Amino acid sequence: TIQRGKCESPNDIQTTVIAKPALQPSEITQKAPSEPLVSLSDARRGFKTEKKKKKSTQQPVEQPPSDLFQVIKYSAPSGELAAYLSPNPGDGKRHPAMIWITGGDCNSIGDVWSAAPRSNDQTAAAFRKAGMVMMFPSLRGGNDNPGAREGFFGEVDDVLAAASYLQKLDFVDPKRIYLGGHSTGGTLVLLVAEYSDRFRSVFSFGPVADVSSYGADSGFLPFNTSIKNEVKLRSPIYWLSSIKSPVWVFEGTEGNIDSLKAMAKISTNAHVHFIAIRGANHFATLAPTNQLIARKILQDTGEFSNLSFSEEEVRQNVMQ
C-alpha cells in the first residue's frame, strides 16, 4: 500500500519505495551519455504522455493543527490543488520558504505535523522550527484533487505553480524560496531542478536515477513503461546537464545509494553536488541533515545562495 505523504518505515519498507535498480549503475552510466545533449525543458516540449486509466482514491486532505498549517488552494495547470501552508507570522517581515515533497504517494499530503523520531522524520519539521515558511503541496490526482496522476511528469508543473503561489505572499521572500523532497519526492524535486532554475537551492534525498527501478507495479508509474521516452523524460540521470541552480543530492550508503553513485559518476555539472552519508539508511539522513540545511538557510541572505556542505560535515551531523 502506498501511504499518503509518507515513505514506508524502515522495518516494513517495500522495494517499490527504496528502489532496486532495474539497470545496474554501470549500465545506466553507459546508456545516458549516448543520449542527445538537449535540456529537459526542450525535450518535454510538445510531448504528450500516455497515462494509464486508474480510479482515484479521492481522499480529502486531512485538517492540520491551525497553529502550524492552514489548507490553501493554489492554481496549477491541472486545476486548483490543495496544500498545507504555514500561517502568516504577522511580524511584517519576509521569510525564507521551503516547498517540501514527501515520499511514498507524493501526489497526496497527510500528517506532516505529528512528532517523528530522529531516525525517521519525514515531516521536514526542522524548517518550520527554524522560522521558515513551509508549504507541502498536493499534486494532480492526489487526495481529492482534479487531474490525473502522471508520475513525475505533469507534477513538475504543479510544483512550479506552488512556487508561483508562494512568491506572491507578502510574508515570503520571493528570492529565497527553496525546494526539497525525499524518496519519490526526491526524484520529483530533482526533475524540477532539471526543468527550471526557479528555486534558490534544491535538496533531493534518496532519488532514483531511472524511474523504471520503481517497478511497473509500484503505483508510482501510471504510464506505459515500455515506451522509451515516457521513462526517459521522468528519469533524472539523463538531464543532469540541464541544472542551472544549486542542487544537493543526499543518500545514506545503506539506502538507495546505487542511484546516487550512478548520477555522480556521469555528472560534469558544477551546480550539482552528491553527498553519500556513510553508515546511514534511506531515512536517518533526513532529520539531522534538514536541521543543518535550515541553520545554513537562515544565513543565506545574499543576492546569490552561499550554501555549501561537505560530506564529512553532513556525516558527522547525522551520526552524532
Kindly label every feature range from the protein language model.
Residues G110-D111, S204-L240, S245:
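Mobile cap/lid helix-loop segments that gate and shape the active-site cleft of serine hydrolases
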Residues G186-D197:
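Short glycine-enriched nucleophile-adjacent loop
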